[in-house]
Regions:
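Transmembrane helix-loop-helix hairpins at membrane boundaries of multipass inner-membrane proteins
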Residues: 1-5, 19-114, 192-200, 481-486
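Central hydrophobic cores of alpha-helical transmembrane segments in multi-pass inner-membrane proteins
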Residues: 7-22, 37-49, 88-102, 119-121, ...
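Alpha-helical transmembrane segments and their helix-start/interface "positive-inside/aromatic belt" motifs
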Residues: 29-40, 161-171, 369-373, 449-457
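Hydrophobic alpha-helical membrane-insertion segments
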Residues: 37-52, 169-179, 379, 418, ...
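Hydrophobic transmembrane alpha-helices and their helix-loop junctions in integral membrane proteins
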Residues: 97-105, 121-133, 147-430
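Cytoplasmic juxtamembrane regions at transmembrane-helix boundaries
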Residues: 101-115, 241, 249, 440-450
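Short phosphate-coordinating micro-motif centered on Lys-Gly-acidic
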Residues: 140
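Cytoplasmic/organellar membrane-interface segments at the starts of transmembrane helices
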Residues: 369-372, 424-490
């Protein structure tokens, strides 16, 4: 019997949560050390799964399956393929770096880390779930703590509004996707929620065309798809730093991944039929998000709308149903997750020192926070899709897939590259270069060593994937084969 490594990854955060809650509230150091140890274990095991995956064999690996509610066809069924293994690693990395950056949090750290780790368990669970009921169960576990993390520890000006807005959008999306999932369960006649069994269910073309929008859009709301995206920037801005990192870095990928795994893979004919309007919606995401980001003066809103734009590329890559587009989207989920975690970490560090996010009021921060400035420049180069960084490895195949699908769409989407470069350069020049405003002289200091370690880990990954794409692309390609075989190698 193989070691249940995926279950250990999924439930390590919950185990840490229970341990953390045993500490008295005044024992903050023990809470932080326990949280960091649990996050490191989860990241280490996630990396083990990632590098141990047998690319030659492909398919689902590290599979565990146990009966849960057999009368209803519900089982605890988990496994990873070439698309989900990078996302498990992504979650582990963001979890670990988020704990490092939250080390100085003094407002109820015990409860903060408990809710953050419940969120992490939900995210891990969705990425490894091979049972629809389990996927929905973990999906809700991931969404629930977001409300509390934002409403309690978020930016006081908008935290209650943002938390409620986020919760309402995601709750409505969950209900819509639940309708589609239940329709598939009853229509299949198989009496099971097992996704591998449902891949072979003989759903009629008409049924797939009707149900696909429920499933896909229900999950894609969490992925920030237009026009259901405007909860996302507000949520980013109100959330504390580690939660923003999780929100943009991981949670939005959860929505896109579930839309692929459940919508596209279980209802392929429905996906094929609805491609035209999906491409248009995501094209709006890509171009509109970039233009809106370019006119923002709040540092965090720039990154928030940038995420909307980049997530549009992910879903657009899926919607092309081409090998290139799907590979690019798979890599982009990982690359964008690490990049936005880095961006929001930097924004949080600048805000902690300056107590403002208004770009016109900032400047010269690279003089006193050199590592922070360098980290943002690295993230900016990734965002612009520069060769040598992970963004290029992700975006180039997506645009190749778009060109194969429809050249004019690729050309319109390419406008976002120019706009992205313009606002990234604007932010770098105004926030990190120039002279340091007088009110900050003597009051702004460099970040801690733990912050630098977190930034270093994120930068190393972004550069590593860009310089040596073979560490990820062949793995993602094995997962893409699983998708394409459902479309007859489309």
């Amino acid at each position: 019997m193989q070691f249940p490594i995926l279950s250990v990854i999924v439930f390590t955060p919950i185990a840490a949560t229970m341990l953390i809650l045993l500490f008295p509230s005044e024992r903050k150091d023990e809470t932080r050390v326990t949280a960091l140890a649990a996050a490191f274990i989860a990241m280490f095991l996630s990396a083990w799964v990632y590098f141990s995956y047998d690319k030659a064999a492909g398919g689902y690996q590290f599979v565990e399956k146990y009966n849960w509610l057999p009368q209803l066809g519900i089982s605890y069924h988990v496994g990873v393929d070439g698309l989900s293994a990078p996302l498990v690693l992504l979650t582990g990395v963001v979890m670990f770096t988020g704990v490092l950056i939250s080390w100085g949090l003094d407002d109820r750290p015990r409860e903060f880390f408990a809710f953050l780790f419940i969120l992490a368990t939900g995210v891990f669970g969705v990425f490894v779930a091979l049972d629809l009921f389990g996927l929905l169960f973990f999906y809700e576990i991931a969404v629930f703590p977001m409300f509390l993390l934002i409403a309690i520890w978020g930016w006081k000006v908008t935290r209650e509004y943002a938390a409620m807005k986020l919760t309402l959008y995601l709750f409505i999306g969950s209900v819509i996707s639940l309708v589609g999932v239940l329709a598939m369960y009853f229509q299949s006649g198989l009496g099971t929620f097992d996704m591998l069994a449902l891949e072979n269910a003989n759903f009629s073309v008409e049924f797939q065309r009707i149900v696909f929008p429920f499933v896909f859009l229900g999950f894609a709301v969490l992925g920030g798809i237009f026009p259901f995206h405007n909860w996302s920037p507000d949520g980013h801005v109100a959330a504390p730093t580690a939660v923003s990192m999780f929100h943009a870095g991981v949670l939005m990928k959860l929505g896109a991944f579930a839309a692929l795994r459940v919508g596209i893979m279980l209802l392929p004919e429905g996906a094929r039929f609805h491609l035209p309007w999906l491409i248009i919606l995501t094209l709006v995401n890509v171009v509109y998000g970039a233009f809106i980001a370019s006119v923002q003066t709040d540092f965090k809103y720039v990154i928030g709308f940038s995420s909307v734009s980049h997530m549009g590329l992910v879903i657009m890559g899926f919607a092309t149903l081409t090998k290139e587009g799907l590979i690019g989207a798979g890599v982009q989920m990982f690359s964008h997750g690490i990049m936005t975690a880095l961006f929001f970490a930097v924004v949080g560090m600048v805000y902690d020192q300056a107590h403002t996010r208004e770009i016109p009021k900032l400047g010269g921060f690279i003089r006193v926070m050199p590592m922070v400035g360098i980290a943002f420049i690295v993230g900016g180069l990734v965002s612009m899709g520069m060769p040598g960084f992970s963004g290029f490895i992700a975006e180039f195949p997506i645009f190749m897939g778009l060109w194969r699908y429809q050249p004019w769409i690729a050309l319109v989407a390419a406008v976002s590259i120019v706009v992205t470069a313009s606002y990234i350069i604007r932010v770098i020049s105004r926030v990190f270069f120039g002279s340091l405003p007088e009110e900050f002289v003597g009051h702004v200091h460099d970040v801690t060593m733990l912050d630098k370690v977190a930034l270093g880990v994120l930068c190393f990954i972004l550069i590593g994937v860009g310089v040596y794409p073979a560490i990820m692309v062949p793995l993602v390609e094995t997962g893409v084969f699983n998708v394409l075989r459902l479309f007859g190698g489309a």
